[in-house]
C-alpha cells in the first residue's frame, strides 16, 4: 500500500493474483504426478512380492507355475508363466502399470525342488 491509501493498488492486486496463479499452475500438477507415481510404485512393489512368492513356491515344491489372476488392494494383477527355452518367465500385468508388464526369469529344472 502506497501513501497511506486505504486499499491495495491494481498493481499489487495483479501481482499477488499472478503469483498465486503461477503457484497453482506449476505446483499442483507436479504434486498430482508425484502422488500418481507413488501409487504406481506401491502397486509395482506388490506385484514384485506376488511374483517372488510364486517363484519361491515353484522352486520349493515344483507347483504353482500356473497363470492366474489375483486381486489385491483393489488392483487386479494377471500373472502369466511362460517357457522360453530353458527358462521360465513369470510376467505380471496390472492396469496401474499402463499396459507395461514386467517379468522375472528363472532356470527351469525338474530336479531342483526341496520336497
Swiss-Prot record:
Protein name: ComG operon protein 5
Transmembrane segments: 13-31
NCBIfam families: T4P_ComGE
Xref: InterPro entries: N_methyl_site, T4P_transformation_protein
Membrane topology: Single-pass membrane protein
Biological role: Required for transformation and DNA binding.
Organism: Bacillus subtilis (strain 168)
Statement: the UniProt record of this protein carries the keyword NADP: no
Propeptide, chain numbering: 1-7
Lineage: superkingdom: Bacteria
Keywords for this protein: Cell membrane, Competence, Membrane, Methylation, Transmembrane, Transmembrane helix, Transport
N-methylphenylalanine, modified sites: 8
GO cellular component terms, semicolon-separated: cell surface; plasma membrane
Keyword Transmembrane: yes
Cell location: Cell membrane; Cell surface
